[in-house]
Amino acid sequence: MSQLDLALGAGVSARHVSFVETGRSRPSAEMVVQLAEHLDVPLRDRNALLLAAGYAPAYAQRDLDEPDMGPVRDAIDRVLRGHEPFPAIVVDRHWGLVSANRAVPLLIKGAAAHLTEPPVNVLRLSLHPEGMAPRIVNLGEWRAHLLDRLGRQAVVSGDRALFALHEELAAYPGGEPGHAPDLEAGAIAVPLRLRVDGDELAFISTATTFGTATDVTLSELAIESFFPADAQTAEVLRRAVAADALTPAP
């Protein structure tokens, strides 16, 4: 992006942007926020930019269990419960499990205890040889998808923890790092194909974030929802609900 494009998009003069970039002018706190908003800089990094410019952080970072976050917890619970009988989870910026609905234990059945005890990292749980990996039918395809997504997230954020996680997961068996297997003919998305109690279940997933977040914690939460990719998967999960086979998530 050129200085002119940035200036036009942020509603400031190109001359002022040039002076800020070269250090000839000290930006105001409002200017820092304005430029960061136009560049879609994450809230955590906006706070870091403000501190570097000599200003106080503008965005709070509350724990999810604080009273002010009550409406957020309620919204998350409504989404998770409303998605049943299909699985849904909430993760933080490092893919740590924040919450899950009652369908999730069906997917992680058989995983080693050390992977399902808090703190749980859902990517590690998915790809670890003692986790879900042995039951993932298309492990190479799913592994390549997750590593690509994690790698892009690490590059964009510059987060060392994400780079370290990527390095760890890439060392697990299950496919050649950096090589994405060919998708099935006519595929519309990378599916998760998982063996569960003798059935092969197939899912496609979506990621949902809070689009109007002004709190760092809230801005970094994502709801990962899994939808049945075929009629059999939907029926198996509906039967699990009817039989009261779904149990509270860990």
Model-derived features: positions:
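Residue-level signal for the short linker/turn that defines the boundary of a DNA-recognition helix
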Residues: M1, P27-E30
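Short basic helix-loop element that most often maps to the first helix and adjoining turn
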Residues: M1-G9
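An N-terminal domain-cap segment
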Residues: F19, A60-A75, L80-G82
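Short amphipathic alpha-helical surface patches that mediate protein-protein
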Residues: T22, L50-G54, G96, E167
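Hydrophobic protein-protein interaction segments
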Residues: D68, D77-F86, V91-D92, V98-P250
